[in-house]
């Protein structure tokens, strides 16, 4: 595995891990966009599986996740245009993998929040040969409106850099409800 730093802007500390397959015939490169409350380390077994089956893998932590949590600001994307910054990071990693492997098929895998980031990136550029979306949702208009109201209340209460246990419970509280042993 090699770490490749990218200078997208001064405060982004963006780097990605490139896990190269050692098989003779390379089938493609998979770029992984992880979900909310995740980090790149959760994909290590999957990366090994992809490598063993002929795929290089590029993976990085989104802003506010994993190695990119700055000053305990979990999930924080930025003061302004945070979503655009996260989408820009995905495209910057893609641009670099395209430079490194111009003749290899590029596949984007987005999971949960990462699928939304992937979809936003695809609205700007269609540079991938394939896209896999996992755990993606499409909330209805009422859900979006209620989420925005609750989010604004929590920002007023905690600031835009605060961590809301209320939102965490609403978003993730029911995920493991049907399982007895919920170690993840």
Predicted regions and their residues:
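Conserved alpha/beta-hydrolase
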Residues: 42, 47-73
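Alpha/beta-hydrolase-fold enzymes
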Residues: 118-184
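Alpha/beta-hydrolase active-site loop
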Residues: 78-98
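Gly/Ala-rich beta-loop-alpha elbow adjacent to hydrolase catalytic centers
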Residues: 110-114, 118
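N-terminal cap/lid segment of alpha/beta-hydrolase-fold proteins
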Residues: 1-23
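Active-site glycine-rich loops that stabilize anionic/oxyanionic intermediates
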Residues: 27-38, 112
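Short beta-strand immediately N-terminal to the catalytic nucleophile in serine-hydrolase-like folds
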Residues: 108-110, 134
């Amino acid at each position: 595995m090699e770490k490749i730093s990218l200078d997208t802007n001064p405060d982004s500390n963006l780097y990605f891990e490139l896990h190269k397959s050692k098989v003779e015939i390379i089938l493609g490169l998979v770029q992984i966009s992880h979900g909310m409350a995740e980090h790149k380390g959760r994909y290590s077994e999957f990366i090994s599986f992809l490598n063993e089956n002929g795929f290089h893998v590029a993976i990085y932590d989104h802003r506010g996740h994993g190695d990119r949590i700055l000053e305990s600001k979990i999930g924080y994307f930025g003061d302004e245009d945070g979503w655009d910054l996260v989408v820009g990071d995905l495209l910057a990693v893609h641009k670099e993998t395209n430079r490194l492997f111009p003749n290899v098929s590029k596949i984007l895998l987005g999971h949960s929040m990462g699928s939304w980031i992937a979809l936003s990136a695809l609205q700007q550029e269609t540079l991938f040969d394939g896209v896999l979306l996992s755990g993606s949702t499409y909330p209805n208009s009422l859900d979006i409106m209620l989420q925005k109201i609750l989010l604004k209340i929590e920002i007023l209460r905690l600031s835009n850099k605060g961590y809301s246990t209320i939102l965490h419970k609403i978003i993730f509280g029911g995920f493991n409800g049907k399982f007895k042993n919920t170690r993840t």
